[in-house]
């Protein structure tokens, strides 16, 4: 699966897509493939403050539990509740159905400091 070019990426394998000034966040195809079959997703409540490089939730796979790290600072405005009943969306559709949270960014410039798809692909090929 190719890395979408209309998103930015963190070193912790989260993606950010800006829509109407808000940041939609999820994990990358690379991350879900490394984790294996996802069986549970824990996400913050709407209104929660997230801080860049700090955990905001977790994903549990058949292999392990892995923390989700916020790529930016901001306030959660929406949570993907579909993942409560269908955590497999993370494996099946990491960039579409499996977005995790929508955030009102504290500073939109932080998003520009994240990696482009080309930079992210380069990083994951080195792993």
Curated annotation (Swiss-Prot):
Residues 22-104 form the Lipoyl-binding domain. The modification N6-lipoyllysine is found at residue 63. The keyword Iron does not apply. It comes from the Bacteria. Keywords: Lipoyl. Pfam families: GCV_H (PF01597). InterPro entries: 2-oxoA_DH_lipoyl-BS (IPR003016), Biotin_lipoyl (IPR000089), GCV_H (IPR002930), GCV_H/Fam206 (IPR033753), GCV_H_sub (IPR017453), Single_hybrid_motif (IPR011053). GO terms for biological process: glycine decarboxylation via glycine cleavage system. Binds 1 lipoyl cofactor covalently. GO terms for cellular component: cytosol; glycine cleavage complex. Its cofactor is (R)-lipoate. The glycine cleavage system is composed of four proteins: P, T, L and H. PANTHER family: GLYCINE CLEAVAGE SYSTEM H PROTEIN (PTHR11715), GLYCINE CLEAVAGE SYSTEM H PROTEIN-RELATED (PTHR11715:SF3). The glycine cleavage system catalyzes the degradation of glycine. The H protein shuttles the methylamine group of glycine from the P protein to the T protein. Is also involved in protein lipoylation via its role as an octanoyl/lipoyl carrier protein intermediate. NCBIfam families: gcvH, PRK01202.1. Belongs to the GcvH family. This is Glycine cleavage system H protein.
